[in-house]
């Protein structure tokens, strides 16, 4: 963060900085650490020695550019070279070579990785920090148990606990525990040293069990190790001490449960007042003794328990840590490979070279597996530029070593006071992962040890100057931090006023002289997505969460538009996302076209390539449009071209729409939205989408697959777009079912003869039928569009097989339609229910028809009043051609601070445009609308204004689905669910009620039984529908009923059932 010493102001750091810093730390430190830990490798006779010199590693320039890696579906990586030395002691030969370790994926300028042509992101993980923690919990009898938990750097745990009988144990698993003297003796201490170093020896002896100080196994370390091994592994009988037993104990217990690491070493040193060097990464007897002492203090009320949800007890595992772990894993595999190669060379009595010893396969495959399958390596969400920024700044409790969505408690998911200024209290996932996937606050950063830090202005007592200081979680609790209306106070009267402040996780009101730090600005506590919501303070937090999440689902529009009412952060979000092209150097523009901008800088020519109609990971269109002119002089950092969702370098996700909050014939019931046809015909909400369809040709057991235009048994109309090579031609308009790539797959000849036409041709004419079947790539349902690109990629990775991949890109232009979803920034969302002709829409007194009609009941119950505050200045700004940038929480200056500027702006717009209806004193903020159908004025004035409404990626073209026949579940014999499985629509309880309300008994019976899960009847029903005959009546029960009977029989009752027809109910009255 940069500090302007003259004005005391600061600039917001780059939003992707957290990823760049992590990768740079891995390149500068993590690589060297792991390479220096790579051991010298010798053969069994110690005649050959191999060694790597990791501090002199080199990264070569990438062989291909990032854009070419995306185009050819390759990985954007660099070759890693390390100097190596091989010594043969018999012949005294020394060979030195620079060997290739493998390909290391590189981070691009957007903070992501391109792996196999796909952009991926590595998410930061929140883990419990290694160290010693104290807690208490009641046992089954209600007695409080005090526990000290030692968490290792590997995630293993061991506990010291004082049970209900006031005895102290070391618990190594849920069912096994050992006494403290055995553990300490096995670690090298005797009873005398233990009692000398314990602060409370009498209490310590009273907590031991069965006078253990008199036991035989405490007199020697060997006996203690044997006793510890028996207790740990439940071994009975006599054991013989050996080095292998010690080695196994060291590997299974000490390394997994006692290795604290450099970060974990600081925790016991601070908590237990120890002075142990940080390079001592294992737990020592001193640690255990100090932990026992502190447990005794906690037992008698002299110590404090730890809050495990506090951020000071957690650390961030960044991209640097994850990549370093994978690199260390790859080097371990490389070490085994080198040992095998040396062993093989020794048997053959030949001297290998360093290049022969080292192979690049372990490193390359390890990173490919990591980026392809690791839970924290995720598919980059590229719906819009904001989505990419937020994805780079995510924090996850999930993943290896973390929590799971099913086991995490509500306490962990909840907001903690230590999150203040570090983790956004609003933005999180919805559903099972609520509270487990959070977002980094806008000014937070990750410290050197993985701690989250937040900046504050330090207030000096001697001078009026303020200095910016980053405080870690836990450090700010000991200072009084002003959080309230300090900005609204004049310097002369600050000392006389009481200021809201934060101290020890509580909010207090204290004098200004007692303040140590102050917050920087109101955005400090929120994430990027939440900071883009105007009038945030007038919203319910749940609706703000929905608004921030739905901004990330907005699709870039054909004609993006800047918001009239914003927060001022839009200008930084667009450049930091990487969607806009930025000038790297100042100069004069000499050439511009759709794909390139060239500038002259001190006689040199600098070219900037633009992105034109490229597909994102979410099938949206990425495109850059130049916004500079030829001959114009640009400065360094100036915007050269806008992205798909930016205008003038500002983030632009939606459109400023004239909305009216009123009911209209029930079409906006329950959040449904009524829109004007103007939004359709004038392409207001038109978006571009690019779908990719791929097909692979490979070698089969019958021969290679072929891409060709000559496809037998297919109509020529389906093949009309193919060229001579069997690929679809660029610019072709394709419909559902058209062939994009013609492919033939060989099959055995006897399979061809099984077909009736094959046997007929061979019997009559003696013609041998083709021994290949067509397996073409076709346009799926809903995939119609224009072909804009065809990529034929050759791969030689599958064990020497020359596999070929063809990708076809189809461009779609989607107008808004009934069923699409739109939403505002304040959590107001809805589905388009009807598109009205513009002449039927309500219109203003100047004849302007309303674009969108929203339900007014959606404001009161949801408590998102911010949308009313947004639309009124939006109307004034639209009439006066102004834009407003409003900082949230402006009511810290005075009461009703958000409301007071609204009416003056409306009055100014009314005066400037000579339209008195804009501001009517009798009902300010509301207008008299006229019904477009009748021409009559509506009875009540209506709140009307300009709201910023994005169109979301949840579109009806992607979701609509119909099933005529498809797969069934094996157990219930009912149709599967989901569009991807060609499933059916579930007729649930509420749907049954709706049909019952219309009295359609026969339709209900068919839907619930015959057409659903009756195996025999559904085939008969299909035939009856085709022929127009009556629906048959089956003589057996449906499968789900039979399943229910079987489940009930498992409880041992005898159940049977019979089918009763209508004729059986014709019973004579006398019999009754």
Swiss-Prot record:
It catalyses: RNA(n) + a ribonucleoside 5'-triphosphate = RNA(n+1) + diphosphate. Keywords: Chloroplast, DNA-directed RNA polymerase, Nucleotidyltransferase, Plastid, Transcription, Transferase. Gene3D superfamilies: 2.40.50.100, 2.40.50.150, 3.90.1100.10, DNA-directed RNA polymerase, beta subunit, external 1 domain, DNA-directed RNA polymerase, subunit 2, domain 6, RNA polymerase alpha subunit dimerisation domain, RNA polymerase Rpb2, domain 2. It comes from the Eukaryota. It holds the Pfam family RNA_pol_Rpb2_2. It is found in: Plastid, Chloroplast. One of its GO terms (molecular function) is DNA binding. It is an enzyme of class 2 (transferase). CDD domains: RNA_pol_B_RPB2. Belongs to the RNA polymerase beta chain family. The keyword Metal-binding does not apply. SUPFAM superfamilies: beta and beta-prime subunits of DNA dependent RNA-polymerase. This is DNA-directed RNA polymerase subunit beta. HAMAP family: RNApol_bact_RpoB. DNA-dependent RNA polymerase catalyzes the transcription of DNA into RNA using the four ribonucleoside triphosphates as substrates. InterPro entries: DNA-dir_RNA_pol_bsu_ext_1_sf (IPR042107), DNA-dir_RNA_pol_su2 (IPR015712), DNA-dir_RNAP_su2_dom (IPR007120), DNA-dir_RNAP_su2_hyb_sf (IPR037033), RNA_pol_bsu_bac (IPR010243), RNA_pol_bsu_protrusion (IPR007644), RNA_pol_Rpb2_2 (IPR007642), RNA_pol_Rpb2_2_sf (IPR037034). One of its GO terms (biological process) is DNA-templated transcription. In plastids the minimal PEP RNA polymerase catalytic core is composed of four subunits: alpha, beta, beta', and beta''. When a (nuclear-encoded) sigma factor is associated with the core the holoenzyme is formed, which can initiate transcription. Its EC number is 2.7.7.6. Its main location: plastid. GO terms for cellular component: chloroplast; DNA-directed RNA polymerase complex; mitochondrion.
